[in-house]
Amino acid sequence: MAKHITGPEIERLIHLLARIPGLGPRSARRAALHLIKKKEALLEPLGTAIRDAVDKVRICSVCGNIDTTDPCSICTDPRRDNGTIIVVEDISDLWALERAGTLLARYHVLGGRLSPLDGIGPDELNITSLINRVIKDPITEIILAVNATIEGQTTAHYITDQLSNFSIKITRLAHGVPVGGELDYLDDGTLAAALRARTNF
């Protein structure tokens, strides 16, 4: 059995860092060591930022984005097109589309995609709240900006079916988004072109 060579506080820091996507145990140890070496310049400000995030960050009750206000700054931005909602799987997809800066629309974060094998059905996603927005607000277009995976396309078809009784235009991102690709990994130019060339769904 491996012997602990650090105190429990450091072990806990390493353990928690290792739970961050993309960081394994070895990377977490390196990150923890770097943070501790830069205690005043990095560790203490990071601790403060994390405490602030715990205290102040909340999920927007309208679109599902995260912000320090509810509704979020996107939902309250008067420059946005109130008639257009871009539907995304995750907040990281919203951020990617915002970086592209092509379309000032509203968003709706599903919180995932349909995946029966993983136990994720319509009730686990923010689909009902999307339908309620369409009922309540004067929406003219829904842009399905879901990932070009099998699960993403299944989700898009399900949403299209649920909205079939409404007189709204439903489009999806153009096929410039590679099949099997994740929005968060695409460059800004590709995302901008995909938004401009969206097609009926």
UniProtKB/Swiss-Prot annotation:
<keyword id="KW-0227">DNA damage</keyword>
<dbReference type="InterPro" id="IPR006171">
    <property type="entry name" value="TOPRIM_dom"/>
</dbReference>
<protein>
    <recommendedName>
        <fullName>Recombination protein RecR</fullName>
    </recommendedName>
</protein>
<keyword id="KW-0233">DNA recombination</keyword>
<keyword id="KW-0234">DNA repair</keyword>
<dbReference type="Pfam" id="PF13662">
    <property type="entry name" value="Toprim_4"/>
</dbReference>
<dbReference type="InterPro" id="IPR015967">
    <property type="entry name" value="Rcmb_RecR_Znf"/>
</dbReference>
<dbReference type="InterPro" id="IPR034137">
    <property type="entry name" value="TOPRIM_RecR"/>
</dbReference>
<dbReference type="Pfam" id="PF02132">
    <property type="entry name" value="RecR_ZnF"/>
</dbReference>
<feature type="zinc finger region" description="C4-type">
    <location>
        <begin position="60"/>
        <end position="75"/>
    </location>
</feature>
<dbReference type="Pfam" id="PF21176">
    <property type="entry name" value="RecR_HhH"/>
</dbReference>
<dbReference type="GO" id="GO:0006310">
    <property type="term" value="P:DNA recombination"/>
</dbReference>
<dbReference type="InterPro" id="IPR023627">
    <property type="entry name" value="Rcmb_RecR"/>
</dbReference>
<keyword id="KW-0862">Zinc</keyword>
<comment type="similarity">
    <text>Belongs to the RecR family.</text>
</comment>
<keyword id="KW-0863">Zinc-finger</keyword>
<feature type="domain" description="Toprim">
    <location>
        <begin position="83"/>
        <end position="178"/>
    </location>
</feature>
<keyword id="KW-0479">Metal-binding</keyword>
<dbReference type="GO" id="GO:0008270">
    <property type="term" value="F:zinc ion binding"/>
</dbReference>
<dbReference type="InterPro" id="IPR000093">
    <property type="entry name" value="DNA_Rcmb_RecR"/>
</dbReference>
<comment type="function">
    <text>May play a role in DNA repair. It seems to be involved in an RecBC-independent recombinational process of DNA repair. It may act with RecF and RecO.</text>
</comment>
<dbReference type="Pfam" id="PF21175">
    <property type="entry name" value="RecR_C"/>
</dbReference>
<dbReference type="GO" id="GO:0003677">
    <property type="term" value="F:DNA binding"/>
</dbReference>
<dbReference type="GO" id="GO:0006281">
    <property type="term" value="P:DNA repair"/>
</dbReference>
